[in-house]
Every structure is written in C-alpha cells, then in structure tokens.
Amino acid sequence: MAFSVVVLAAGKGTRMKSSLPKVLHKVGGVPMVQRIINTVRSLGADNIHLVYGHGGDQLKATVVEENLNWCLQAEQLGTGHAVQQAAPHINDDEDVLILVGDAPLIREDTLSALKAVKESCDLALLTVNLDDPTGMGRIIRENDNITAIVEHKDATEAQRAIKEINTGMMMMSGADLKRWLGELSNDNAQGEYYLTDVIAMAASEGKRIQSAQPQSAVEVEGVNNRLQLANLERALQNRQADELMTNGVTLLDPSRFDLRGTLQTGNDVIIDVNVIVEGDVTLGNNVEIGANCILRNCTIADNAVIEANSIIEEARVGEACTVGPYARLRPGAVMQKNAKVGNFVEMKKAVLGEGAKANHLTYLGDAEVGAKANIGAGTITCNYDGVNKSKTVIGENAFIGSNSSLVAPVNIGKGATVGAGSVITSTVDEAALAVARGKQRNIPNWPRPTKK
C-alpha cells in the first residue's frame, strides 16, 4: 500500500541555546532531520511532508531534497496542530507514518516493523519499554489491544508500574488521520492540540491499536539539549563501531573512533585511536591507519599505511603507499603505487608517480612528479603568483636536491638533477644537472658581533 511520511521539525529547541534550528544540529556529521529523511527514503516512502517553523530559511538551505513537501507551521500550537499543516496533502487511501525530527537514530528495520504491524490493525504505535518511565505516558492494554495512554501524573500506582511508554511515532490511514485531526481540541492547560489524543479517539471507535518496538530505546530518544545531543552522538558512534568490527575491521579502541559519513573497507583493516572519518571514504585490504588521522572523502588502496597525525582530504592513495607521519594530502592529491610522502609534506592538485618519494618538509602544489623521482627535504613548488596557479612537471627518476624552489611553470626532465638550494625558473633538460644559487663567499678571521 502507498504510504507517506510526516516529519515534525518545527520546534525551536530553546534548551539547545542556539541560533540553529534544533533539527539541524548534527549527529554523526549529518543534520538530525536529514538522517530521518534518508531513512524514510530508503524505506520507500511515496511522499515526505516536512513540517517546519523556526529557522525555515536555514532548513531549506540545508535540506536540499527533491520531492519534499514543505508545510509551514507558523505558530507552534502542539504536535496535532503540526500534523494538521500536512493534512491537505495527504490522501485518504494511503497510510501515513508520523515521525519526530529530533530522534535521528531510528532504524529502517524498526520502521519496517511498524509498517508491518499497521497492515493488521487500524493504528500502529511505536512504543518502548524503559527501566525508569517516570514522567512518561503509559501504554494501557486490554486483551493485548491498546486502549489508552495515561500520563504519569494521572496514572494509578498499578499503571505507574507499567514500563511501556509512547514515543509519539505512529502510523494510520490518511482517512482516519484527517478525521481525527479535525476533532482535536486545545482545551487543556497548555492550550495546544496534542497528536496523542487521536489514540483515545481510535479506542473510542473500537479501532484495533497495536504496537511495534525498536531494537534499543536509543532509537527513539530525542534531543532537547547539548547533553542529549552528545549522548546520541556517542550512541551512534558505538553502533557504527560495532558494525565495522563485526565486518572484520580492527579498531584498537572503539570508544576513540568517529565515523561522520560512510566507510567502505576491505579485509584486515586496522584503525588506531582518535581517527576521524568524514564523508565517503574507502579503505582497501590490509590498510593501516595510524593514531589521530583525519580521512575525508578519500580512497586508500590495498596495503597502504597512513602514519599518525596525517590528514587526507579528497585525495587518492595508491597501492602500498606510505603517508606520514604529519602529512597532509589536500584535494586533488594522487599517490600512485609504492609512492611515499613523509613527515611535514603537503600535496594539493599534485600527482606523485609510482615509487616516487617526498620524504620530508615539502610542498607539492599543481605538480606532476614522475615515477621513482626523489624530492629532497625542503623542496617547494612555487605555484602561485598572487593571481594564477601554474604547474610544475618533474620527470621520472629526477632528483631534486634539498631546499630547492621550483618556480612554476617549469619542467624538470627525466633523470635530471637539481642541486640543493637551487631556485629553478626554466626548463631543465633530461639527464642534466641544474644548479642555481648564489656563489659562496668565505671571509677569513671574521669577528663575530659581541654583546655590549
């Protein structure tokens, strides 16, 4: 049966103490509301209605989605009022799944289970059992059918002993939902329209009300402050670490690993402590990642070793390469098979050929380095004149002496040698030696300055 989703995302989130709408705060590097949208997309929803209010411009600038229906809740008058804003876009003959925008860890299989329950009843609720349900609305059942939700303050002692509580997430037919929304009243202490009132309406009509439950209570936990946000962040990281280790990745300390995107791994990958993975990252077989590294939108091929404290962003590291420690590969950096980048080397829009080496203290920008070339310590490609970027080409088997400056655009031929300390401004032919530095002058018996 066709189904639509209503995501409630209009709240300001006052306790977050932020200018950012609550649902745009990130968990695992992704805004909370975007995580929920991604989940229901994978579930196969026909339509998604996003109810927004506070920070609408920020939401629209961040959540760029096709086929997303934006429903403005100009005044925040309760959850029932929020769903009413989406009602004109809901069809009678479809089921409607209602979710909250600040519970980002809900799993696809949990929502699939809720959908399956709805197929055999009129109203399906997502409930959860808590060890301490104090302050929460209790689920009341009669012959296994849910008949009511009783708020904690109104519950009897027997009802307060019930551990099952309502999460606010539910599914019903469009026709039932719209009818019940039209009957909601704000005759309560808060003067708001509560979505949970539809449960009592359904029960009074003799509707069959059933429930599904998540694998873990953390799936339905919401965020109202920074502490809760941090707790959900850690819960997500623990979940992701468990999945990686189950799939064969060695995490030397799972509690000190952060995945803020997607990570594809081969066999026998080893990741040391304090590694952060952002965006889309792929690691081949037998890759080793040292401590304190940041990997962002990059690909690292089989048998590569990334030493500690290195940063790799939008770069490609070839098979059996070595990077670091303390190296930085910036966007457009490419290392081919068996290449090596050592400590305090930076690459940007540069290709380091097969077997080539830049072992220390080097900047390679807008450069192409041939196979088996050796780049000495302190070498700089001077690629920027203040307006334009220019390219440096270094041929295979070339040797660049330490502390050389290569002023682009410039070409160093195959097998050429550049003497240490040179400033190269023009082409160096194949197999030639280029030396371009000031002549040394020695002054005998030089009197050193003395302090007065």
From Swiss-Prot:
Region listing for Linker, in residue ranges: 227-247
InterPro entries to which the protein is assigned, alphabetical: Bifunctional_GlmU, GlmU-like, GlmU_C_LbH, Hexapep, Hexapep_transf_CS, MobA-like_NTP_Trfase, Nucleotide-diphossugar_trans, Trimer_LpxA-like_sf
Keyword Lipoprotein annotated: no
UniProt EC number: 2.7.7.23, 2.3.1.157
GO cellular component: cytoplasm; membrane
Region of interest called N-acetyltransferase, as start-end residue ranges on this chain: 248-452
Region (Pyrophosphorylase): 1-226
Alphabetical UniProt keywords: Acyltransferase, Cell shape, Cell wall biogenesis/degradation, Cytoplasm, Magnesium, Metal-binding, Multifunctional enzyme, Nucleotidyltransferase, Peptidoglycan synthesis, Repeat, Transferase
CDD domains registered for this protein in UniProt: GT2_GlmU_N_bac, LbH_GlmU_C
Residues of the active site: 360
Description of how the protein assembles with itself and partners: Homotrimer.
Protein name: Bifunctional protein GlmU
Upper lineage: Bacteria, Pseudomonadati, Pseudomonadota, Gammaproteobacteria, Alteromonadales
Chain's gene name: glmU
